């Protein structure tokens, strides 16, 4: 092998190659709003339970149950880990990751000291994840699997909605609050106070 590499080097023959994957059968007509923009879809469902202190805006994520479609799993442990990671990343996006700029337009929340991402202690006390069974990808993918890196990110909306409904409890669920993301304790408390004022008016 070393002789072959040496000879290729001397003769200036490249021993590596580069290529790009092009997803087949996707197209989109922007003018008509029709087409097939994705090769396949991944589906998931999540239900989350929170406890919200309506006097402080602080909350605890008690429980989340997730069912996710990964097609035919290649490795159940890896798929579950990807779902956990995507979900918790999404929880951070919707509950703690806040962007602030100074008067000159410079980002102030640019480091771990100012940009708050979830910790291990922010995971739900109970986190149940199940993979949808008997649902191979109808497309001819590797062993009929589906990508599972990014799709679970959106399952965190269940936490945001649980917090929104918990805030609505102060007015006996009579209205759906206009809760802004991220649902920090401060934003939750402001939302709760606004709901109370509207209810008293």
Which residues are covered by each model-predicted region?
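C-terminal catalytic domains of large/alpha subunits in multi-subunit enzymes
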Residues: 1-201
